[in-house]
């Protein structure tokens, strides 16, 4: 007797007896369906024989098959199962893949035509399977399973055309089902059999299940390099230093593309015959229209002499000391005017302006949250998203002593030794020194006509204090790199690099998050996240607690400018943990706002981040502001850009390219000191060559990629970027060509002063005046020749002139002055400019 179904009541709803498909309920429903099917087959009347060979999709030929009229006593479960349970358990992405495989919709961008309907698709699958399993009563041939699902979904004909051949569509069987004539599969797949012992592979002693599990795990750097171990005698630093030459990226060579067969119109051809300074200046004026007329020669004077007003809390000023003058031997002057500024001097007003922007006025954008609970959750998400837990458990060795010794070897010239290191317990670690960066970072926006860039600030400990904390954080960072997953890249150190072999940025979606005011926006929440992550990496808990305690409240002081102010949790831009801490904070915020499993490659460096994925990224970037107190901006349109460099595909290797707009600005820098042998200029030239070393491997495809990225990033013309590459090729060829971009007033003065008297002659106009003792010119210099050669003649002329009337001598002098003024040009050199230029 069939038990009645449970009635609807509040009690049955709470105890789960109503509305829940329990195994007993499913078995009861299947038993009722089986009984109904057996009763229907007992009353079944045979139909005329029908050839159903064409309705069965199989490759081998079938002679014929007729539906038997003999009743059966049992019914297979395949007749009563709905066939859609597997699709109901699929995830949305898997169900969408099955929909595209069967229905084959037309994709226009990200839009499907026909649109995807989950309920309609599962119903179509169930109905198609029911039609194939039911006895066929028509003489027409049904479509294949995939085509039948598409026909039901699109509401078209279920049968093939009688005259037309069957469309050859690539199909795969429905997962778990096999359609064969005369029998129905239950979806069971036989297990693999071992070829040696004929046993099931999972029960065979030859099968290594642990090896299969390790091969399925995600590969990390710790699998490639056995960097350390408890039973070895080689420490971490020694092995890394030995592996350094072998871990450098291999540069692939390329062949130059052949010349095209078609002829380019000369009027459309780009000028590539010669590179000139004026062409580069014209490109700069076109790309950066407000930079060509920028001149900050007297900017420092305006700042210090004009009225100044600012609003900051808890600022201490000491103006009893004068700002000492910085000795300056002169700088090289650029030929190009690219908007670069002079070096800034840390005066009181300049420092207050920088502190106002970089350290004061901390934004309060986040909401009130439970810091203790949420910081642990963010640290746990960080560990699961980026780190290989097995590699972290095995890599339990932090080599601090070797790194400390290597760090001290960097300072032999400065005289720093182990005896000079102070006792950290006797030092007040809450006090930080402060200074501004003399070099101002060039801006790429067209705002120099209304705005002046503010210099960045540096908050740092003394060298003796930093040298004791840096080895510990270096060791932790090395261990952190070894335990990262393969898809996570940190472009720093000996293992990682900006160049990625075997990965293409083409046909990928990019995600770049721009975090502004990153240092001063960090608060107590970020400090607690770093504390949990440092403890997970193996940092001793007392040291972690000690380090975080004197970052809760600190005091910065600029001794030169006489400015001091208290700060709290914000990032110290010059201590031993700056880069490591910024990278950890950026990765933790990114993992909380986005699911990292959707990305194929993740790059982090300080406050810069870049991610690549095959599908459009899905996440909630608003949490950067509401939770982490950051001013975040998702860059649109997104380009592969990180650390002020573009990524492009060169010779099957993803390499970085420095943006041309910043390199143009660096060609007009004003910070190169003057030297007689051009040592500083040559060092600047070698830095320029190192940044543009990728040009030797560039092809036309790389130039096109860089032009497109340039247009998308800066909203400038890509043709200008391609034109500047020719200038870069010229100035990186040799040092003599690079010297054309700079000059010095001192060099021109020395050039003028090296002229010989015989080569450089200046004729002066003489004006004879009546004197009592003789004739003297207007310059006051006696032009009489030496007495040893013309003593007699000069004396006789003087005596004769005394006997002549005064009027006659005056007329003669006037006639001589008129003759000299008409014959000789008036060229004079003032004595005060004897060391200057002559024009």
Swiss-Prot record:
- Which top-rank group of organisms is this from? Viruses
Segments passing through the bilayer: none
Keywords annotated in UniProt: Nucleotide-binding, Nucleotidyltransferase, RNA-directed RNA polymerase, Transferase, Viral RNA replication
Q: Name one GO molecular function term.
A: RNA-directed RNA polymerase activity
Which reactions fall under this protein's catalytic activity? RNA(n) + a ribonucleoside 5'-triphosphate = RNA(n+1) + diphosphate
Looking at its record, which EC class is this enzyme?
A: transferase
Nucleotide-binding in keyword set: yes
Q: Which SUPFAM superfamilies match?
A: DNA/RNA polymerases
Describe its function.
RNA-dependent RNA polymerase which replicates the viral genome composed of 3 RNA segments, RNA1, RNA2 and RNA3.
| UniProt subunit comment | Interacts with replication protein 1a.
Query: What is this protein called in UniProt?
Result: RNA-directed RNA polymerase 2a
Its source organism is: Cucumber mosaic virus (strain Q)
């Amino acid at each position: 007797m069939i038990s009645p179904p449970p009635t609807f009541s509040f009690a049955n709803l709470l105890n789960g007896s109503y509305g829940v498909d329990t195994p007993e309920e499913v078995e009861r429903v299947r038993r009722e369906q089986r009984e109904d099917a057996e009763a229907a087959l007992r009353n079944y009347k045979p139909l005329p024989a029908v050839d159903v060979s064409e309705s069965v999709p199989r490759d081998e030929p079938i002679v014929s098959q007729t539906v038997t009229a003999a009743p059966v006593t049992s019914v297979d479960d395949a007749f009563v199962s709905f066939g859609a349970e597997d699709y109901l358990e699929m995830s949305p992405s898997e169900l969408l893949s099955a929909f595209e495989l069967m229905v084959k919709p037309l994709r226009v961008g990200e839009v499907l035509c026909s649109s995807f309907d989950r309920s309609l698709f599962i119903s179509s699958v169930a109905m198609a399977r029911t039609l194939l399993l039911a006895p066929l009563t028509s003489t027409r041939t049904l479509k294949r399973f995939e085509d039948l699902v598409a026909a039901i979904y699109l509401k078209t004909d279920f049968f093939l055309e009688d005259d037309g051949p069957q469309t050859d569509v690539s199909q795969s069987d429905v997962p778990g089902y096999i359609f064969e004539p005369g029998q129905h599969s239950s979806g069971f797949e036989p297990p693999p059999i071992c070829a040696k012992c004929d046993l099931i592979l999972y029960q065979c002693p030859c099968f290594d299940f642990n090896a299969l599990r390790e091969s399925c795990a995600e590969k990390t750097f710790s699998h490639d390099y056995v960097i350390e171990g408890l039973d070895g005698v080689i420490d971490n630093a020694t092995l890394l230093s030995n592996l350094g030459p072998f871990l450098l990226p291999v540069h692939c060579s390329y062949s130059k593309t052949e010349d095209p067969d078609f002829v380019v119109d000369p009027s459309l051809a780009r000028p590539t015959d010669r590179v000139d300074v004026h062409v580069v200046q014209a490109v700069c004026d076109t790309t950066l229209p407000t930079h060509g007329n920028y001149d900050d020669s007297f900017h420092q004077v305006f700042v210090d002499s004009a009225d100044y007003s600012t609003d900051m809390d808890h600022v201490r000023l000491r103006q009893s000391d004068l700002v000492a003058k910085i000795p300056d031997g002169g700088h090289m002057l650029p030929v190009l005017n690219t908007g670069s500024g002079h070096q800034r001097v840390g005066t009181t007003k300049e420092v207050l302006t920088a502190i106002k922007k970089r350290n004061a006025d901390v934004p309060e954008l986040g909401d009130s949250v439970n810091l203790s609970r949420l910081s642990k959750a963010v640290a746990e998400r960080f560990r699961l998203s980026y780190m290989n837990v097995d590699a972290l458990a095995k890599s339990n060795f932090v080599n601090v002593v070797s790194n400390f010794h290597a760090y001290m070897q960097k300072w032999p010239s400065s005289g720093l030794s182990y005896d000079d290191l102070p006792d950290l317990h006797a030092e007040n670690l809450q006090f930080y020194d402060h200074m501004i960066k003399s070099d101002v970072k060039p801006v790429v926006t067209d705002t120099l006509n209304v705005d002046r860039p503010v210099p960045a600030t540096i908050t740092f400990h003394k060298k003796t204090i930093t040298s004791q904390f840096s080895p510990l954080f270096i060791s932790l960072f090395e261990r952190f790199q070894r335990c990262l997953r393969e898809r996570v890249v940190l472009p720093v150190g000996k293992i990682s690099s900006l160049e990625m072999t075997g990965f293409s940025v083409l046909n990928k979606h990019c995600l770049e998050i721009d975090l502004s005011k990153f240092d001063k926006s960090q608060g107590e929440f970020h400090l607690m996240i770093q504390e949990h992550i440092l403890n997970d990496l193996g940092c001793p808990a007392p040291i972690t607690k000690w380090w975080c305690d004197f970052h809760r409240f600190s005091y910065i002081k600029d001794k030169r400018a006489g400015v001091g102010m208290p700060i709290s949790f914000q990032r110290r831009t010059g201590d031993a943990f700056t880069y490591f801490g910024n990278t950890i904070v950026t990765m933790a915020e990114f993992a909380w706002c986005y699911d990292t499993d959707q990305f194929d490659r993740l790059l982090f460096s300080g406050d810069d981040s870049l991610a690549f994925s095959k599908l459009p990224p899905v996440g909630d970037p608003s949490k950067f502001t509401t939770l982490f107190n950051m001013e975040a901006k998702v860059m649109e349109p997104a380009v592969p850009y990180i650390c002020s460099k573009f990524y492009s595909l060169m010779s099957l290797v993803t390499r970085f390219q420095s943006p041309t707009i910043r390199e143009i600005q660096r060609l007009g820098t004003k910070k190169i000191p003057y030297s007689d042998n051009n040592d500083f200029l040559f060092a600047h030239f070698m830095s320029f060559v190192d940044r543009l070393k990728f040009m030797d491997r560039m092809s036309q495809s790389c130039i096109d990629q860089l032009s497109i990225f340039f247009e998308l990033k800066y909203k400038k013309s890509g043709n200008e970027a391609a034109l500047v590459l020719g200038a870069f090729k010229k100035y990186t060829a040799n040092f003599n060509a690079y010297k054309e971009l700079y000059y010095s007033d001192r060099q021109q003065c020395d050039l003028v002063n090296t002229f010989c008297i015989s080569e450089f002659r200046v004729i002066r106009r003489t004006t004879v005046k009546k004197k009592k003792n003789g004739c003297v010119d207007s310059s006051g210099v006696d032009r009489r020749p030496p007495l040893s050669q013309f003593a007699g003649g000069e004396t006789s002329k003087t005596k004769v002139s005394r006997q002549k009337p005064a009027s006659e001598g005056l007329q003669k002098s006037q006639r001589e002055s008129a003759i000299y003024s008409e014959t000789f040009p008036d060229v004079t050199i003032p004595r005060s400019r004897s060391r200057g230029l002559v024009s």
